[in-house]
């Protein structure tokens, strides 16, 4: 028996030392514009608790660049070993990098530029035998072209956050109407010269979020969800014991390997009189605007994002910034519940001292248009957080009560998106002789789709389209004058689709909830009819004002919307006079005699169209029917030791709808618009813009 045991033991596999792992960014296959700046980071990782890999060597195109590592020496004197960050006091401060885990050895080089088009190869090795090789494709965008070739002096990119094809169709139906099966008019987006389809996936997920969705358009590089203008690295700040919230401040959130933004690249190559403008209906530190100027691994790091708009303006070229988010620009007061910056910095005052004209209301913004020349730089902060949506601004006092409360009196004087767009164009066209890049976001299309609120989402699409019309009118003037250097390229697109919005039918008045007093599924008339029902007319019958907004969101034949990526929710087919969450994931319970809010699986919110809804329609409640959701709701549960946070997405109950991976439409007008036909990746949009805007 002893001999047998020995023989068996000899046959058992002998554990081998854990192999070092190497990660390189930019990732293999990245397409990089010739001369565009980017950072290279190489991370060699040993076993947790073990020694850091030794002898990290980095070779680019056959040339050893290991010595260019900006990280401090670690144990043994090797740069970047033991997780060392940049040396204390490293300058410039924006290039500093935080420490990484001690079982890693890292390489970091900032602001690399590859001028020669073609394939470039980087190989990293360690003394332990680990190796990684990546190849990048560098494309030429500065090649000479015939004098008649299209070129864009200005670029206006309008992004409807979450704006899928169905939402465009819905806005057309409500804003223009249909007669005898044909649309009575077109949206501004419909009139653009070329349309294509964009694939939207992020670096690490089939379904993107807004941060990489935007930054892919303007860097040409993929980014991971929640990140903007950067690649992932291993310096993410660890959570303190018992900490559940994601860190929102600190060097590690702003030290990731960067990729140069379109506006910064054009400013660097065109000259310092090239300017950048960012306009949004969201908080200006939100993912989409920030993903045009600020590099961070956490889209939620609002205070630091706001600071970098100003502190890095010589690089980002920012001359116009408008939207909500005033709380991130003023110091926090001592009043309970008051918003403001924890660091006490008066960023609003600093912007003004830097030459920005600051406005805080629609009245003040309109006054700029009557006071002579447009200001050279413009900061508009019209809300403490995200701006009020179009449905509640247009419908105030009619079909919306959102702004009726005295507590919201100060929010009644907010501009519409098209007004902000006009003001931005006035400043940029007057003070940016080297051209400009303007991003305009219809932000709350997405936010209201997350809330499974069809009316508020569609109203925001109509508002967004009115901003598109302003951009097209501006381009029509510049593209027909005698100056070929001020021609304007206009693009209208989305970062992703939200909610899986589908147009399921039109309400059959026979089963209208207003008539029955409750909602039924039979109200949703579908496409199948009998031969003797040809006289039925089931098209939406909205009346609309001069701007295209319906005057009543609940006509007898309203457009009905369904959702493929929603939580559980109640549906009564009627517009909500107040914005109310579709589902909840918390409950108030008694613990030791105290009322405590505890996390729960997401469930339909009975306060919106459900059994506890106190809203009225025509003086009475109209209870809705329960619609079962399909996305993760946190009901399964998983012990933390079995589901670490970096692997489990269902730990947080999702009480809103999710994004989807559907391709999104992109429409273009102006010089080179035809190059945007077809189906292409979001990173390819960057290259197509650059080839047009880089020709001067």
Describe the role of every protein-language-model region.
Residues 18-36:
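Short, compositionally biased P/S/T/A/G/V-rich stretches that sit at domain boundaries
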């Amino acid at each position: 028996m002893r001999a047998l045991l020995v023989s068996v033991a000899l046959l058992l596999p002998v554990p081998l030392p854990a192999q070092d792992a190497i990660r390189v960014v930019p990732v293999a296959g990245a397409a990089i514009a010739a001369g565009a700046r980017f950072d290279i980071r190489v991370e060699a990782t040993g076993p947790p608790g073990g020694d850091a890999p030794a002898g990290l060597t980095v070779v680019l195109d056959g040339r050893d660049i290991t010595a260019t590592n900006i990280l401090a020496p670690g144990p043994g004197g090797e740069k970047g070993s033991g997780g060392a960050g940049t040396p204390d006091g490293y300058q410039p401060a924006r290039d500093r990098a935080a420490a990484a885990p001690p079982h890693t050895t890292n390489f970091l080089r900032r602001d690399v530029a590859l001028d020669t088009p073609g394939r470039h190869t980087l190989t990293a090795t360690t003394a332990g035998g680990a190796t990684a090789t990546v190849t990048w494709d560098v494309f030429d965008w500065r090649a000479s072209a015939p004098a008649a070739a299209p070129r864009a002096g200005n670029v206006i990119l309008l992004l409807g956050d979450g704006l899928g094809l169905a939402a465009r169709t819905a806005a057309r139906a409500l804003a223009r109407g249909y007669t005898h099966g044909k649309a009575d008019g077109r949206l501004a987006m419909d009139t653009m010269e070329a349309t294509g389809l964009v694939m939207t996936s992020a670096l690490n997920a089939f379904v993107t979020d807004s941060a990489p969705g935007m930054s892919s358009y303007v860097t040409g590089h993929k980014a991971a969800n929640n990140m903007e203008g950067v690649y992932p690295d291993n310096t993410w700040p660890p959570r303190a014991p018992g900490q559940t919230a994601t860190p929102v401040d600190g060097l590690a959130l702003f030290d990731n390997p960067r990729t140069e933004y379109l506006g910064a690249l054009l400013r660097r190559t065109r000259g310092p009189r090239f300017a950048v403008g960012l306009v949004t209906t969201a908080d200006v530190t939100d993912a989409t605007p920030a993903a045009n100027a600020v590099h961070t691994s956490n889209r939620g790091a609002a205070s630091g994002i706001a600071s970098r708009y100003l502190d890095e303006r010589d690089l980002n070229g920012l001359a116009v910034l408008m939207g909500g988010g005033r709380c991130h620009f003023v110091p926090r007061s001592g009043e309970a519940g008051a918003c403001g910056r924890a660091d006490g910095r008066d960023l609003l005052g600093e912007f003004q001292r830097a030459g920005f004209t600051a406005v805080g209301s629609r009245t003040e913004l309109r006054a700029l248009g009557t006071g002579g020349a447009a200001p050279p730089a413009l900061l508009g902060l019209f809300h403490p957080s995200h701006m009020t949506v179009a449905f509640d601004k247009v419908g105030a006092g009619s079909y919306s009560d959102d702004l009726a409360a005295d507590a919201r009196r100060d929010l009644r004087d907010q501009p519409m998106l098209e007004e902000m767009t006009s003001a931005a164009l006035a400043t940029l066209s007057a003070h940016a002789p080297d051209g400009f890049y303007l991003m305009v976001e219809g932000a709350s299309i997405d936010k209201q789709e997350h809330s499974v609120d069809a009316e508020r989402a569609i109203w925001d699409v109509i508002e967004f389209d009115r901003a598109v019309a302003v951009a097209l009118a501006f381009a029509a003037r510049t593209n027909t004058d005698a100056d070929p250097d001020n021609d304007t390229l206009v693009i209208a697109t989305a970062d992703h689709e939200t909610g899986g919005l589908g147009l399921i039918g039109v309400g059959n008045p026979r089963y209208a909830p207003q008539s029955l007093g409750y909602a039924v599924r039979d109200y949703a008339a579908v496409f199948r009819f009998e031969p003797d029902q040809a006289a039925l007319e089931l098209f939406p019958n909205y009346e609309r004002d001069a701007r295209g907004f319906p005057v009543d969101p609940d006509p007898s034949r309203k457009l009905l919307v369904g959702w493929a990526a929603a939580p559980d929710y109640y549906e009564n087919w009627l517009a909500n006079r107040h914005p109310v969450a579709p589902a909840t994931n918390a409950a108030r319970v008694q613990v030791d005699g105290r009322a405590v809010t505890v996390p729960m699986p997401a469930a339909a919110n009975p306060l919106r169209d459900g059994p506890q809804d106190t809203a009225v329609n025509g003086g009475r409640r109209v209870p809705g029917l329960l619609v079962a959701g399909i996305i993760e709701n946190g009901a399964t549960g998983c012990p933390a030791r079995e589901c670490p946070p970096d692997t489990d997405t269902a730990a947080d109950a999702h009480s809103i709808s999710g994004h989807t991976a559907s391709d999104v439409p992109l429409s273009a007008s102006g010089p080179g618009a035809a190059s945007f036909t077809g189906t292409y990746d979001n990173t390819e949009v960057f290259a197509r813009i650059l080839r047009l805007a880089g020709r001067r």
